[in-house]
Each structure stands twice: as structure tokens, then as C-alpha cells.
Amino acid sequence: MPIGVPRVPYRLPGEPYSQWISLDDRLYQERILFIGEPIDDNLANTIVGVMLYLNSQDPQKDIVMYINSPGGSVTAGMAIYDTMNHVKPDIVTVCVGQAASMGAFLLAAGTKGKRFALPHSRIMLHQPSLGMIQGQASDIEIRARETLRVKRRMNELLAQMTGQPLEKIERDVERDFYLSATEAQAYGIVDRVIQERSEAMAG
């Protein structure tokens, strides 16, 4: 039986009584974002909108993004990535569970020095896919060229974010490339493996 949207009690400053609000809204008030599902346009629009709002509220205070995602849409993920770089606050990224494909890309895209993984996290890199290619031969050729362009650009960005040579990135992502939390730290996807939330908050 579905339990619906989790709700938690929250009391506004100066109010005598608490009200029930969604868990997501409560986390947003603490400047915490949680990507806990496949990344699609709807999720990206929500995450982008919240980041823009939090930026307008306090451009100096960190935004914390927890990631437990199998990946998803390249275009949706890049919308989140570009917004992470567009807003002024540092973006703290924390992998809990798994960060695969675009989830791993966003994990690595956090502010340098503020990218974390919990001890039993699993990270997976692989080459991007723009979905099934169908249509006329000319359409297939156009889509194939675009796939190669996106792949090249994402590999270049991963090389910048991790410090790995581009040639190594290109080799590693040809097939699913799994890393433990400590291996992800050595690779440059995260900066530290942490035990407690306070470690991430401390930066």
C-alpha cells in the first residue's frame, strides 16, 4: 500500500502550533536537496527551481545535494549541472547508496573540497546514451554525431572535475566502470569518505 508523500511537523517562527509539511519542503528549508530517483525533466525542473530560490535567499550559504540515483536523462542532468555552476552558493554533494551514470557526474560536479561519499556507496561511470536511434538514415547519422559530441564533452568535463587524463576517462567509460567510495576518492570523483552528516556540513 503506498504511503503517499512523507510529511513532518514544522512550526513557523512566532507561531504557537506546528503544521504538517512535506519532507521535501522541510529539507529545502535546511538547504538540502535529495536526488533519490532516476533523473528526468520533472526532477531536474524541481531541483533547478529550488537551487535558484535558495540562491536568491542566501547566495553565501552552501546548498547540500544528497544523491542516490541510477542516473537518467543527459539533458535533464546537464540542466542541473549548469545550474550548480550558475548559482553562487557552493554545492556540497554527498553520495548515499549509489551514484551511477548522470548521478555520478553530478556527484563529481560539486564544489571541489566539498564532494563526499558515505562508506558503502557505489559509484558507476559509463558513456552517455541519448536513447534509441530511429528514423531515416540521415536522422540516424545526425543523432549519432550528436551522441559522440555529448560523449566527448562529458568526458572533458569529467577530466576537469576529477583531474584524470582525458584518455583515461575515455577508456574507463567505454563500459560500466564501478568504484567503491574509497576508489571514487582516489579517482577524484569525491574528496572524502565520511561517516556523519556533520562532516559534510563542516566542509
Swiss-Prot record:
Cellular component terms (Gene Ontology): cytoplasm; endopeptidase Clp complex
Transmembrane stretches, start-end: none
Reaction(s) the record says it catalyses: Hydrolysis of proteins to small peptides in the presence of ATP and magnesium. alpha-casein is the usual test substrate. In the absence of ATP, only oligopeptides shorter than five residues are hydrolyzed (such as succinyl-Leu-Tyr-|-NHMec, and Leu-Tyr-Leu-|-Tyr-Trp, in which cleavage of the -Tyr-|-Leu- and -Tyr-|-Trp bonds also occurs)
Top enzyme category: hydrolase
Localization in the cell: Cytoplasm
Signal peptide: none
Active-site residue numbers: 101, 126
Gene Ontology BP terms: protein quality control for misfolded or incompletely synthesized proteins
Keywords, ordered alphabetically: Cytoplasm, Hydrolase, Protease, Serine protease
Major site of localization recorded for this protein: cytoplasm
GO MF annotation: an example: serine-type endopeptidase activity
InterPro entries associated with the record: ClpP, ClpP/crotonase-like_dom_sf, ClpP/TepA, ClpP_His_AS, ClpP_Ser_AS
Enzyme Commission code(s) on record: 3.4.21.92
PROSITE patterns the UniProt entry points to: CLP_PROTEASE_HIS, CLP_PROTEASE_SER
Subunit: Fourteen ClpP subunits assemble into 2 heptameric rings which stack back to back to give a disk-like structure with a central cavity, resembling the structure of eukaryotic proteasomes.
Sequence similarity: Belongs to the peptidase S14 family.
Role description: Cleaves peptides in various proteins in a process that requires ATP hydrolysis. Has a chymotrypsin-like activity. Plays a major role in the degradation of misfolded proteins.
Name of this protein: ATP-dependent Clp protease proteolytic subunit 1
